[in-house]
Design a protein with these regions (language model features):
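Residues at the starts of beta-strands that form the adenosine-phosphate
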Residues: 49-51, 129, 195
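Conserved alpha/beta core of the MobA/IspD/sugar-nucleotide pyrophosphorylase nucleotidyltransferase superfamily
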Residues: 157-221
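A recurrent flexible, glycine/aromatic-enriched loop bordering the glycosyltransferase active site
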Residues: 149-159
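Conserved N-terminal catalytic core of the sugar/cofactor nucleotidyltransferase
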Residues: 36-99
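Conserved beta-loop-beta/alpha segment of the NTase-like Rossmann-fold superfamily
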Residues: 76, 83-146, 160
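Residue-level signal for inorganic ion chemistry
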Residues: 9, 35, 92, 105-106, ...
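N-terminal glycine-rich phosphate-binding loop and ensuing alpha1 helix
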Residues: 2-61
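Hydrophobic packing residues within well-ordered alpha-helices of enzyme cores
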Residues: 18, 42, 63-64, 120, ...
Length: 221
């Protein structure tokens, strides 16, 4: 029997680098908030997914009002974001039962496709913990003292979201105390001793972080 699917969309960031009144996840691109573009990719999957959006209390009324006005997303869960991404995801897991599959995705990664999401869920069903990653293509340098030294980019990968897990694995992993090294869910799971798997990501599955990224989103969405 296949596990029920959940998507935890992390949208609690303040977006200070955007120089905008609204956090970046709420900025309109092609007539819709960036967050809506992201959520729609999950809603377009063939297999239904329960939507959980983690956001700051400050913007919950804004989002609820937008959904009502736009007749969008009648059913969703809206936990409160925490002090860090780790704590935000931990809050969301209170709404996910054991025996499910849970994808954790950045609310400002709108370029995933339903087909790509489906593949990640299917892989996680088999292995328990999976994330997409892409090789680095730019030359990289490591900061060293007052200067920099070249680094071998073939030794590194850029890890993306969504990262998909058996819910009981992710819940147990999030029972650990917070560590500053926990920059994504895969790191939390690996630190807890669970095996992980990386699969080929999408080069264009970028995280919208800067005004320049926003210009890219405007061109592609």
């Amino acid at each position: 029997m296949e596990r029920k699917r959940y998507a935890v969309i992390v949208a609690a960031g303040s977006g200070t680098r955007m120089n905008s009144k609204l956090p970046k996840q709420f900025i309109e691109i092609a007539g819709k908030p960036l967050l809506r573009h992201t959520v729609e990719k999950f809603l377009a999957m063939d297999v239904p997914v329960e939507i959980i959006i983690v956001m700051s209390d400050e913007y919950k009324d804004w989002w609820k009002s937008y959904c009502r006005r736009s007749d969008f997303l009648e059913k969703y869960i809206l936990p409160t974001g925490g002090f860090t991404r780790f704590h935000s995801v931990k809050n969301a897991l209170e709404y996910v039962p054991d025996g499910a599959l849970v994808a954790v995705h950045d609310g400002v990664r709108p370029f995933v496709t339903p087909e790509f999401l489906e593949g990640l869920f299917e892989e996680a069903e088999k292995c328990g913990a999976v994330a997409p990653a892409v090789p680095l293509v730019e030359s990289i340098r490591e900061m060293s003292g007052d200067g920099t030294v070249p680094a071998d980019r073939s030794r590194f990968l850029s890890v993306q979201t969504p990262q998909v897990f058996h819910s009981e694995i992710l819940r147990k992993a999030y029972g650990q105390s917070y560590d500053t090294s926990f920059t994504d869910d895969l790191t939390v799971v690996q630190k807890a001793g669970f095996p992980i798997k990386l699969v080929a990501g999408l080069r264009y599955n970028v995280k919208i972080t800067t005004p320049e990224d926003l210009e890219l989103a405007e061109a592609l969405l």
